[in-house]
C-alpha cells in the first residue's frame, strides 16, 4: 500500500518562493510513488496586506496535480473544513509549511486539531520568524508552532530559533534543495540576451527575485560603484530583475548618483515562470548579497542552472552540503569592498569557475523527501 501524504502550502498558480518550493516538493513525492494530496489556499492574503501587485502567476496556465484549494487563513470555518478533510483522508503523514506569522491563528488551530486527533505531522520551517519581523512575531510563532513537535529546517540558524520557540522540539536539518530549471524552452546565452536586450559582449551578473531590504541590493550597488571607481566595470553589466517590495526610489537614486546607469539594467516587475528561464540563461554569474535571512530560493534556482554564484556569508551555511557547492564564492555580508573583490574573481577565473548543471538537483529533492519520511522521527 502506498504511503499517504497530505502536503499543506501554496502551489501554482500562486507565485513566489514558497509556492515554487511546495510545487517542486509535491512533484517529487508523486515521482516517488506516494499517494499525495496537496491542500492549498482558497485565498492567501487580503489585497491590502500583500506587498506585490498580485499573488498569482497565470502566465503559462500550469497547475499542480492532486490539489484541493480549500484552506484560508482568513476564515475559521475553512480551518475546520480543512482539518475534517485531512482526517477523512487518513494520511500517514501531514506536512505543513511555515514561513509567516500571518498564518499563526489558522496554523495554531490546524496543528492543535491534528495533534489531538493523533495524526503524525511535520512542519517544514522556511523562516521561524519573518525576515523583517517585530517582537509580536516571536509570540505569534510560539503560539502557532507550540502545537507541533516535529520540524524540518533547512538552515542551522532556524534550528536554533525553533529550539527557543518550542520546548522539546524534534528537529531535522535537510539543506534547501536545488531547483530544477524552469520547464521552458532551452535557448543559448546569445538568444537569451537578445531576447532581454542585453549586451552580448559583457559579463552579466544577475540579481533576481522580489526586492526587499534584507536581500542586499544596496550592498551590490555599493560594490558596483567601487568597481566603477577602480575602472574595473567596463566588462560588466548587472541585471536587477524583480518586483520591488521595498522603496524603489532609493535604489534608482543610488544608481544615478553613482554614475553606473550604463552598467545596471533594471527590470522592475515580477518575472513570470515562463520568462524566468531566459534571465538565468542570459547570465554569467549570480549574486545573492543578503544582509539577513535564512536561505535563498533564487540562489537555488541559479545553482539549478549551473551558474557560478557569489553569496553573502549570512546565507551560506547550508550550501556546503549541497552538490555543485564548489561553484560558490562567499563574501562577508554587508561588506561591499569584499563583494567587489569577489566579482573581480569571477572575471579573472572565467576559465576555471565555469557554470555547469550535472543533474544533481533531482537528488537534493529526493533527499528532502527521504528526510521527511524518517519514520522514527514521526513515531511509527
Predicted region positions:
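Glycosyltransferase donor-sugar binding loop
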Residues: 41-45, 237-250, 269
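N-terminal strand-loop element at the rim of the active site
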Residues: 11-15, 27-88, 158, 163, ...
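Nucleotide-activated donor-binding/catalytic signature segment of Leloir-type glycosyltransferases, i.e.
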Residues: 70, 249-270, 325
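Conserved donor-binding/catalytic core segment of Leloir-type glycosyltransferases
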Residues: 198-215, 221-224, 239
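Short hydrophobic beta-strand element within catalytic cores of glycosyltransferases
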Residues: 308-313
Amino acid at each position: 500500500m502506498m504511503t499517504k501524504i497530505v502536503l499543506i502550502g501554496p502551489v501554482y498558480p500562486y507565485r513566489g518562493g514558497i509556492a515554487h518550493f511546495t510545487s517542486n516538493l509535491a512533484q517529487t513525492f508523486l515521482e516517488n510513488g506516494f499517494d499525495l494530496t496537496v491542500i492549498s489556499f482558497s485565498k492567501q492574503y487580503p489585497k491590502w496586506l500583500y506587498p506585490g501587485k498580485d499573488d498569482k502567476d497565470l502566465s503559462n496556465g500550469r497547475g499542480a496535480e492532486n490539489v484541493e484549494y480549500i484552506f484560508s487563513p482568513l476564515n475559521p470555518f475553512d480551518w475546520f473544513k480543512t482539518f475534517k478533510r485531512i482526517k477523512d483522508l487518513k494520511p500517514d503523514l501531514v506536512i505543513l509549511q511555515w514561513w509567516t506569522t500571518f498564518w499563526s491563528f489558522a496554523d495554531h488551530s490546524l496543528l492543535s486539531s491534528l495533534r489531538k486527533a493523533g495524526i503524525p505531522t511535520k512542519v517544514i520551517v522556511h523562516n521561524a520568524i519573518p525576515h523583517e519581523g517585530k517582537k509580536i512575531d516571536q509570540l505569534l510563532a510560539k503560539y502557532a508552532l507550540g502545537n507541533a513537535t516535529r520540524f524540518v529546517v533547512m538552515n542551522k540558524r532556524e534550528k536554533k530559533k525553533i529550539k527557543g520557540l518550542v520546548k522539546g522540539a524534534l528537529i531535522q536539518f535537510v539543506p534547501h534543495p536545488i531547483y530544477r530549471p524552469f520547464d521552458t524552452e532551452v535557448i543559448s546565452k546569445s538568444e537569451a540576451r537578445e531576447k532581454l536586450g542585453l549586451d552580448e559582449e559583457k559579463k552579466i551578473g544577475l540579481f533576481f527575485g522580489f526586492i526587499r531590504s534584507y536581500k542586499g541590493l544596496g550592498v551590490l550597488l555599493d560594490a558596483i560603484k567601487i568597481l566603477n571607481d577602480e575602472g574595473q566595470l567596463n566588462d560588466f553589466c548587472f541585471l536587477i530583475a524583480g518586483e520591488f517590495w521595498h522603496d524603489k526610489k532609493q535604489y534608482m537614486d543610488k544608481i544615478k548618483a553613482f554614475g553606473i546607469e550604463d552598467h545596471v539594467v533594471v527590470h522592475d516587475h515580477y518575472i513570470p515562470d515562463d520568462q524566468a528561464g531566459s534571465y538565468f540563461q542570459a547570465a554569467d554569474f549570480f549574486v545573492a548579497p543578503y544582509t539577513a535571512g535564512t536561505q535563498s530560493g533564487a540562489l537555488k534556482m541559479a545553482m539549478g542552472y549551473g551558474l557560478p554564484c557569489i553569496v553573502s556569508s549570512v546565507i551560506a551555511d547550508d550550501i556546503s552540503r549541497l552538490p555543485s557547492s564548489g561553484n560558490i564564492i562567499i563574501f562577508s555580508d554587508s561588506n561591499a569592498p569584499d563583494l567587489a573583490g569577489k566579482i573581480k574573481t569571477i572575471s579573472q577565473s572565467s576559465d576555471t569557475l565555469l557554470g555547469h548543471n550535472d543533474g544533481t538537483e533531482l537528488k537534493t529533492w529526493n533527499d528532502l523527501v527521504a528526510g521527511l519520511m524518517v519514520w522514527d522521527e514521526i513515531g511509527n
